[in-house]
Amino acid sequence: MNTAARTIGISVLSALLLGPVVSFAQTSKSAALAAELCKLLDERKLDSVAARQAGDQYVGALYFAGTQLLVVRGKFGSAARMDDLLGKKEYREVYMDLSGASDLKTRAFIMDLGANGLRFKREDNQPFDTADLGGKSYQFDGEWGRAKMSEDEYKKTFAATDEDYAQMLQALIATLKKPS
């Protein structure tokens, strides 16, 4: 009986200590939004979408059905050109312009491999998501030590990037839901 009580006590303690880590690792604000965006793109048979985000920032995405979303956001030198392309629904052109000519300091580039939102770490030898933010690259593979980051820094970077990515996805979804 004493052994059974000890086993239960250890199990409860483990769940209490590891529960927050596991739930943090599984929490992704962008996951549901990525699924919604992919569904809208599939329904409309589109492989790209773009939008104006807050202020003078623009966001564009390329979609490879079921496999990946490549999303870029940044400031572009000519707002008139971006607005013209958006008006014509030339989303791929917006994406290309942002990828090549947006201000590096403001550029964010997300490679959502799996098109399922950012994942905290790699799962079972699956590809991992990456982000290039203002000229600095991050790999969300769960290997913060290899990236010369503390676990806390990795968690904070992931949470901030996931929040930012969720906002980009919301802008893209709003574009697709807008009546033509």
Per-range role (PLM):
Residues 26-180:
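Calcium-binding acidic motifs and repeat modules
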Residues 10-20:
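Bacterial N-terminal signal peptides
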Residues 5-6, 16, 26, 32:
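Intrinsic disorder/low-complexity segments
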